[in-house]
Amino acid sequence: MITRLFAQLVSLSIVTYWNDAIVATNFSWLFITFFVMTFTFRTFSRYFKKPIIWTLYFFLCLIAFLLLWAARIHINILFSFAFGDVYSFFMAGVFLFYGFGELLPIGSDSDVGEASWVVNPATGASGSGGNGWTESAANDPAREVSLAPFPPQLTHPVPFPAEPGSPDPVSPPPPIASFYSRIERAESLHAGNIELAEDLQRIQEMERNLENERSPYRGRELAARIDWEVRELEGKVARNRAWDMVRDAQLDIWRQGLDQELVRQQENESRLEERRFQSHSTNSLFEADSSRDN
């Protein structure tokens, strides 16, 4: 805020010494059209993920800026003849207190971090426009979720292998033996699926709030929050997929062990049956020899 006010005062002192109305008007249109291009690019560029689309959109905004700058002479001539110096200083004032101030940063990171927004999980009520978001109190740190700076999880790679062809960096997977104690029962698996469904529903609700958000600053904060929630959900899905793989591997081991145990039992039964047959044959021969002796 201090830098913005300082820039406005400096610009006002410069415009004060402008005596030519056309020069002042031209410079005002230059900065106003540049502000329109910058504001449009800054508002809609977050929807483009690929660099080539981002670059093409930048040049599109630049062409629109040049067209506005080329058309300013006709507007200047019309309004300068009608209003004279009043129009000139009016355009300069618009540039001073709106255009050039908006081109500067909004302040330090601490200024951005002061605005914290949390969703009410119980009611979903809102104190600002009914969009499901409420401004949290400073004395309630348990429910306060600051959207800037980002949580430290954003700087860490996904701790499990990603899908084939994924550009996300991943860390080496943990040893498979560490997951043997994490094999859940059917109830815990169902609870995990419910948790993933709730997270997905919360992300969809935040996306609807983002579509209805009119403030560009809160929109950017909400978009950053959505990105973080999506990364968290992807991490949970990756962990569940890894646990499923480990569970399947353990079931295969148990199935192989069961098959081997069944084979051993069949071999033992075969040996026992063979011994019984040999014993029965020996007893029959002994009884036959005894009957001959008698």
UniProtKB/Swiss-Prot annotation:
It comes from Arabidopsis thaliana. It comes from the Eukaryota. The chain crosses the membrane at residues 21-41, 51-71, 77-97. One of its GO terms (cellular component) is mitochondrial membrane. Its main location: mitochondrion. It is found in: Mitochondrion membrane. The keyword Mitochondrion applies. This is Uncharacterized mitochondrial protein AtMg01200. PANTHER family: ATP SYNTHASE 9 MITOCHONDRIAL-RELATED, TRANSMEMBRANE PROTEIN. It is a multi-pass membrane protein. The keyword DNA damage does not apply. Residues 184-215 form a coiled coil.
